[in-house]
Design a protein with these regions (language model features):
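Active-site SXXK
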Residues: 173, 190-216, 243, 282-286, ...
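Active-site Gly/Thr loop motif
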Residues: 360-421
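C-terminal motif of bacterial Sec signal peptides marking the signal peptidase cleavage site
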Residues: 13-16
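N-terminal leader/targeting segments and the immediately adjacent pre-domain N-terminus
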Residues: 21, 123-185, 190, 208-213, ...
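Short, surface-exposed linear motifs at loops/turns and structural transition points
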Residues: 18-124
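Active-site helix/loop module of the DD-peptidase/beta-lactamase fold
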Residues: 210-246, 290-325
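Structured C-terminal helix/loop/strand segments within mature extracytoplasmic catalytic/sensor domains
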Residues: 401-452
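Active-site-proximal alpha-helical segments within enzyme catalytic domains
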Residues: 281-285, 321-342, 410-426
Length: 452
């Protein structure tokens, strides 16, 4: 009998004691913590799901976090409403490159219940190199990243075999690899070829954000009529956006000459995708709209702000300008692209335009934005053909990659999910190519071996 009384007392005592309880009425809620998503250097997103209120109303819910295990509401926390169900919590004020432990919580009259613990590591802060040709650029080693050192030499051997002049990998803006081949150096300029189309895309967007032009307006609004040999009604269908998207409807089989006699009507603008150098007319549009030369506007609004010292547009004939720069200058532009138009805290080109530029711009070639190539789409077109190819344009590379591609394998690869920029300059890897080649797939097999 004494044992029964003692046991009853113990059970009564335990039922009245909970480290999170503030009352003896009802039970604690039942809650789970949502997996972490969208982690940056200073923030993350989580949340919770309350499936039972324990018999009394949920008066407070959210997530709490700490650099120690099992955080409680006495640590940092969010407050995200009341009641049952799922909720999302935006966690801010975090420190970069730090491990955090996170739990969802729900408070009712019985106390505070906690969900399972989840962890996240905040990103390293994005680095931007100082301006200047001789500026020191911070590096990060293969070992620091936990990458595969044994995969480096096969990559470099392949690059040299394929007539590469220079190669760089940036992660979070820091140089991981920087290699020069066949007498090329860090100060040697090289041509971008059509990779430079992305410079034109960006500066066109800058001119639009300054109110100088609207890409939805027809090209002739800025440079007058007669810039093509198309009938006037057809010419007036062509907008600046059509030039950005490569769906002007002009004949792409007549070579690089962009004089009016060579810009001939094939289809209405917006109905046919074809890779065409008529995009260069956007430089005339910007010059006319700004009242400056293209070079002056480009240098002031983009080149100088990114510290792309010494880069220059060189007239290659046929009305085309080709950009030349060092490899590091190309990497600077790629780093701005990785940061959606931002450079060291300054928004060079607004993010809305940049997102449009790096997403599908029309419904014909899904792998093309505003003069940017896009990976991971269901199909793609290539220059000089109307064939549709199924699948991702570089299947060995991350699906979220977007690219600036130029003749003879001039490359800027931007991979947001990896916080990575990859640069390749040089002679053609194999036979002369306008943009895509088998080189891309093999190269990305070797790059992926670094981090997989």
């Amino acid at each position: 009998m004494k044992k029964i009384i003692l046991l009853s007392f113990v059970l009564l005592f335990l039922s009245s004691c909970s480290s999170d309880s503030g009352s003896d009425s009802g039970s604690l809620a039942t809650i789970t913590t949502t997996s972490i998503s969208e982690t940056t250097s200073i923030s993350a997103t989580s949340g919770g799901n309350i499936t039972s209120d324990g018999g009394s109303a949920i008066t407070l819910r959210g997530v709490c976090w700490s650099i120690n295990h099992n955080p409680t509401i006495t640590d940092s926390r969010t407050t995200d409403g009341t009641g049952l169900g799922t909720f999302t919590s935006n966690i801010t004020g975090l420190t970069s490159n730090t491990i955090y432990y996170i739990r969802a919580y729900a408070t009712n009259s019985a106390g505070t219940a906690y969900g399972n613990e989840v962890t996240t590591t905040t990103d390293e802060t994005m680095y931007f190199p100082p301006n200047g040709r001789s500026a020191t650029w911070t590096t990060k080693s293969i070992a620091d990243l936990g990458w595969n050192q044994s995969a480096v030499q096969p990559l470099l051997d392949y690059l040299e075999l394929k007539h590469t002049k220079s190669f760089m990998i940036l992660v979070n803006g820091r140089i991981v690899l920087e290699n020069y081949f066949n007498g090329h150096t860090a100060t040697t300029p090289w041509y971008w070829a059509s990779a430079g189309k992305t410079l034109t895309s960006t500066v066109t967007g800058i001119a639009q954000q300054e109110g100088l032009l609207n890409i939805n307006n027809k090209v002739s609004d800025y440079i007058g009529t007669g810039w093509t040999s198309a009938p006037l009604a057809k010419e007036n269908l062509i907008t600046c956006k059509n030039l950005l998207s490569m769906d002007s409807g002009l004949n792409d089989a007549l070579g690089d000459d962009v004089s009016p006699s060579n810009l001939q009507y094939v289809a209405d603008a917006g109905t046919r995708w074809a890779y065409h150098n008529v995009y260069v007319k956007l430089q005339d549009v910007v010059a006319s709209a700004s009242g400056q030369t293209w070079t002056s506007y480009f240098n002031t609004k983009l080149r100088d702000k990114l510290g792309m010292t010494g880069g220059a547009w060189i007239d290659s004939g046929d009305g085309l300008n080709v950009y030349w720069s060092t490899t590091r200058n190309m990497a600077r532009f790629g780093l701005m692209a990785l940061n959606k138009g931002k450079w060291n805290g300054a928004q060079i080109i607004n993010e809305t335009y940049f997102n449009q530029a790096t997403n599908t711009s029309q419904n014909i070639n899904l792998a093309y934005g505003y003069l940017w190539w896009l990976n991971g789409k269901a199909s793609y077109h290539l220059p000089q053909t109307q064939l549709v190819f199924k699948g991702s344009i570089v299947p060995t590379a991350p699906n979220d990659m977007f690219m600036a591609w130029g003749k003879n394998d001039q490359k800027i690869y931007v991979i947001p999910s990896k916080k990575m920029v990859v640069i390749r300059m040089g002679e053609a890897a194999d036979a002369e190519t306008m943009a895509k080649s088998d080189f891309d797939e093999t190269l990305w097999t070797k790059i992926s071996a670094l981090y997989q």
